Structures are given as C-alpha cells and as structure tokens.
Design a protein with these regions (language model features):
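Long, His/Glu/Asp-enriched segments that create or flank divalent metal/ion-associated functional microenvironments
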Residues: 29
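Polybasic, low-complexity binding patches
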Residues: 35-67
C-alpha cells in the first residue's frame, strides 16, 4: 500500500490460515514488523479494528464500484458462513456490526491464546 502501510491479520494468519476480510487491517509497516506473529491486545486494538472494519462495510454497502470489488473478493476470500450471513448483510448498525464481529472473533482470539500465541505489548 502507498504510504508505508501493510495489510495485516488481526489474528495471525498462521492460526486462522486464511485471508478473509473480517480479519484484515491496514497497519503501518514498522508496526506490522513489530507485531509479527503475535496477537494485538484485545483492548484497545479491537475497538479500533472494528471501527476500520465498519468503514469498509459502509463503503461496500454504499459505493457500487467497491461493492463490485467486494463481490469478486467474496468468491475467493469469504468462506466463514457467519461473515456472509451476518457481518456483511445490508443495514447493520455500527453497534450490530461490532457485536457480530466481536462475537465471532473473540473465541478465535482466545483459542489462539490457549494455543500459545503471545500478545503483542504495544
């Protein structure tokens, strides 16, 4: 990405083994290197992450050209049933979106912690 940003996985790729949109975020390249294969602290990072995800969701819903890109991406990179049926359905409020995202991501995050993934202390 221009401007020194990478696309990072909130929950490390080595744990989720996918590139689904619900787990991706733009991140400063140097911070991405520092985070490496660790989990971000749930608080405060999840709130910021969910906010960025909601911005993406609104763009998908409101901009036909972005919705078209989302549709192409969805075919290859959106295999979680909950994401297609709940997260990216039309007309979610921000609160609904955040709750759906947290409800589905927190168990995956906690499972990664139990499997020994370290938390990135930033």
């Amino acid at each position: 990405m221009p401007g020194g940003y990478d696309i990072d996985h909130f929950i490390p790729w080595s744990f989720v083994m996918n590139d689904e949109l619900w787990n991706l975020m733009p991140m400063d390249s140097s911070l991405n290197s520092s985070k490496s294969n660790r989990l971000p602290q749930w608080d405060p990072f999840f709130r910021k992450f969910a906010g960025n995800q909601y911005i993406l969701y609104k763009l998908i819903q409101e901009k036909p050209e972005i919705h078209k890109l989302y549709e192409a991406c969805w075919r290859d990179n959106l295999h979680s049933i909950w994401a297609g049926q709940e997260l990216y359905r039309p007309r979610n409020t921000k609160e609904e979106f955040d709750n759906i995202l947290a409800k589905n991501m927190r168990p995956v995050y906690d499972s990664a912690r139990r499997q020994g993934y370290e938390v990135w202390m930033r």
